[in-house]
């Protein structure tokens, strides 16, 4: 665009109008696309864009918003997965979110009445199997479900029973006459091992391994010899758990890579729909109407600047 054109757009306050439009978009890329919009010069392009907006307005009135807030950027993640990389829980959840939004939008767009944007909804390819595989395995960014695999469930059962055994041994120590040697009657963890806080002057009264000392030097965190074997078992189980989680994430990543084309296309379509429905929402907010188009002239009847209050504007 020429400098004169940009100056004209600034004078007409187009950037402010586009900012209002961007506020109506639900996705980050949708907002960016709204801000980057410039006036169309081809009459056919203008007519198509107007029809898209009008179709979105009608659907918003009849069905409400399709909801695009769950659409997260996934292109970089899909590319890395395609190269054999293992994705993080956050990346996999974002991909599942895109698939969920694609499924919701596809259902939203199902209608006997065809519009100029119907083909966009029909082009979406939800993958419920992959979506469920991810969401059933990953409960949150920090938590993998026990049910993610039978191996993980088995490892965690053993971890819980071993941990209970360690705690039981330490609880008996805390409840015995040896408790007088403790700084506090609690069980704590140092270096992934269960320990008890022992007074410095009695550190030799409880045989075991010292894993830490308080900054004041008054407390020694000791792993009693009676729990060393069980703690070792627990450490081994934790390593097995970590390895199995890595395997699960790698497997889910490979599944995403296998469907990267469809997922990427869904993302592109959802961003496009987000911008179209942003136009529809702003149209409703401004109480705008679709104009008739002509190649020969421009006739403004009852027109007003969209930033002016309708009640105060003089048409």
Where are the regions that the model predicts?
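Conserved NTPase motor "head" modules and their coupling/switch loops across ABC/AAA+ ATPases, GTPases
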Residues: 196, 261-315
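Extended, Lys/Arg-enriched charged tracts that mediate electrostatic binding to polyanionic substrates
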Residues: 153-203
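Extended, charged coiled-coil "arm/hinge" scaffolds of SMC/Rad50-like chromosome-maintenance ATPases
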Residues: 126-142, 229-250
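Active-site phosphate-binding and catalytic loops of NTP-dependent enzymes
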Residues: 82-88, 110-116, 169-185, 275-289, ...
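Conserved mid-sequence domains
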Residues: 220-222, 227-229, 233, 238, ...
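Conserved amphipathic alpha-helical "coupling/scaffold" segments
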Residues: 1-151, 155, 259, 266-280, ...
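Gly/Lys-enriched N-terminal cap/neck module of very large, oligomeric protein machines
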Residues: 17, 192, 196-213, 218-222
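Intracellular alpha-helical coupling/juxtamembrane segments of multi-pass membrane proteins
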Residues: 155, 159-162, 241-248, 252-276
């Amino acid at each position: 665009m020429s400098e004169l054109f940009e100056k004209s757009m600034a004078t007409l306050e187009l950037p402010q109008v586009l900012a209002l439009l961007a506020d109506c978009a639900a996705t980050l890329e949708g907002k960016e696309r709204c801000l980057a919009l410039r006036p169309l010069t081809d009459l056919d392009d203008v007519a198509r864009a107007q029809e898209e907006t009008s179709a979105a307005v009608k659907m918003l009135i009849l069905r409400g918003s399709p909801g695009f807030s769950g659409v997260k950027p996934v292109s970089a993640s899909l590319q890395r997965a395609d190269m054999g990389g293992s994705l993080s829980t956050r990346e996999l959840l974002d991909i599942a979110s895109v698939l969920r939004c694609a499924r919701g939008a596809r259902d939203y767009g199902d209608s006997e009445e065809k519009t100029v944007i119907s083909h966009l909804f029909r082009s979406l390819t939800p993958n419920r199997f992959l979506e469920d595989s991810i969401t059933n395995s990953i409960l949150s960014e920090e938590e993998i479900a026990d049910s993610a695999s039978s191996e993980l469930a088995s490892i965690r059962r053993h971890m819980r029973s071993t941990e209970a055994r360690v705690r039981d041994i330490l609880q008996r120590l805390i409840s015995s006459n040896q408790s007088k040697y403790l700084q506090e009657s609690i069980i704590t963890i140092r270096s992934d091992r269960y320990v008890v806080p022992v007074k410095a002057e009695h550190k030799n009264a409880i045989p075991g391994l010292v894993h830490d000392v308080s900054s004041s030097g008054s407390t020694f965190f000791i792993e009693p010899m009676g729990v060393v074997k069980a703690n070792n078992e627990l450490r081994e189980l934790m390593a097995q758990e970590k390895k199995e989680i890595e395997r699960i994430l790698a497997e889910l990543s490979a599944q995403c890579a296998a469907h990267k084309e469809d997922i990427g296309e869904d993302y592109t379509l959802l961003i496009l729909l987000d911008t179209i429905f942003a136009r529809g929402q702003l149209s409703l907010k401004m109480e705008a109407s679709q104009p008739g188009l002509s190649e020969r002239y421009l006739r403004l009847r009852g027109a007003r600047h969209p930033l002016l209050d309708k009640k105060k504007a003089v048409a």
